[in-house]
A protein has these predicted regions:
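FMN-binding flavodoxin-like domain, especially the glycine-rich phosphate-binding loop
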Residues: 3-9, 13-37, 44-136
Length: 136
């Protein structure tokens, strides 16, 4: 099965999580395309993918602010309609619920179907857990 991982924001734990979930999905015989959004990254067509993972770090305690480059990328993407999507954040002490809610709202505004969401606390355990959510 083909999946895409889209993530934005400068966070070392997020980078490490992307590597761990890439390995976990590969071990299960699935293909994962990793897309780190940033300046100069063109939004693509996500139609070829059956599953889409989207994640970011928590940037603010109260407002649930998302990385601007992630918002811009998702808004410009095509092919997200009716896609099975998993939203995740790299959790902090505070601000987790609001950030996750805002991320899911952004994805749903593009027509994605959220099948799971997760606040990432244990990189190893949570990468295996989310990788196991890919089902035919």
């Amino acid at each position: 099965m083909r999946a895409a991982l889209i993530y934005g924001g400068d966070d070392k734990k997020l980078e490490l999580f992307a590597k761990k979930i890439f390995s976990a999905i590969g071990r299960k015989g699935n293909e994962l395309k990793v897309i780190k959004v940033g300046r100069g990254i063109n939004a693509g067509n996500l139609s070829p993918y059956e599953f889409i993972f989207v994640g970011c770090p928590v940037l603010s305690v109260f407002k649930g602010k998302l990385p601007s480059e992630l918002i811009d990328y998702i808004k410009r993407c095509t092919g997200m309609e009716r896609k099975k999507t998993i939203a995740f954040i790299i959790s902090r002490l505070m601000g987790n619920d609001k950030t996750l809610k805002n991320l899911m709202s952004l994805l749903e505004s593009k027509g994605s179907f959220i099948v799971d969401f997760k606040q990432i606390r244990d990189l190893d355990k949570d990468s295996e857990l989310l990788a196991s959510r890919i089902k035919y």
